[in-house]
Amino acid sequence: MPDPAQGSTPPSTTGLRGKVALITGAAHGQGRASALALAREGVHVAAIDVAKPLDYPGYGMGTSRDLETLAEAVRALGVECLTFAADVRDDAAITAAVATTIERLGKVDILFNNAGICGYGLAHELTEEAWDAMIDINLKGPWIVGRRVIPHMIAQKSGVILNNSSIAGLRGMGRLGHYAASKWGLTGLSKSWAIELAPHGIRVVSLHPTGVNTPMNDGLAELEGATPREIAERSAGNLLPVPWIEPEDVANAVVFLASDQARFITGSEFVIDAGLLTR
């Protein structure tokens, strides 16, 4: 495993150097930005992404090439990067990815449950397939990944789990009932894990961004026959005069929450909403 001190990684002030992060939904968007931000702090990365199209919601996902270029960019920072093409709903694939990460990198210090989807539809008109896909990817997926990582964190008596929820995990949203249900569920799971895992020195925090300028936002716009800006403004309505935040804004929060600077933050909701929830 490369020594971060010998690579091109700049000096870290976060206490993260040498740690290992496992990130889902890592090929693009918030996951990719977070992987790169952590790598700049000297963190080794295990990147998981489905890396193929999904029947629902129907917009483009990350690709195997995205994973490859992420690995190249992370390694260029002087740290290791493992990549896994795996669906968070596939327990066998996730179990294998976690086992390989432990074997190759020795531990998992940080879990960023970021993989997720979004789609529109009135709740009473959704198909069962749409409902199940949303809940299984956005809520069951983090649970599947978490239950494979948590025993290792318990054994090492430390760890940080960051679950990427949404402002929709703190309020209701029209035509996003299944999405909101999945994100509220993730908020509840985060709080419950925080209670259960605190005795083992493990912190758990949920993140709640407003709309983010990612390929998912572009895909939703295409499905709706609208521009990304129209979708962002329709879905969000931020207090600050911006249609969205950037993936790097979420990545900055991930670095902070994973670091020693946040050592007493657990069981809470970290809101990055450009003031939306204040309206």
Predicted features along the sequence, with ranges:
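Canonical Rossmann dinucleotide-binding motif of NAD(H)/NADP(H)-dependent dehydrogenases/reductases
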Residues: 14-46, 50
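Substrate-binding pocket helix/loop in short-chain dehydrogenase/reductase
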Residues: 122-123, 130-135, 234-235
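Short, small/polar-rich loop/turn modules that mediate ligand/substrate recognition or access, typified
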Residues: 198, 203, 265-267
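Residue(s) in the substrate-gating loop at a strand-loop-helix junction
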Residues: 166
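Short C-terminal tail/terminal secondary-structure segment
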Residues: 2-12, 171, 254-255, 266-279
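A conserved structural motif in NAD(P)-dependent oxidoreductases
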Residues: 238-250, 261
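Active-site helix of classical SDR
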Residues: 146, 182, 190
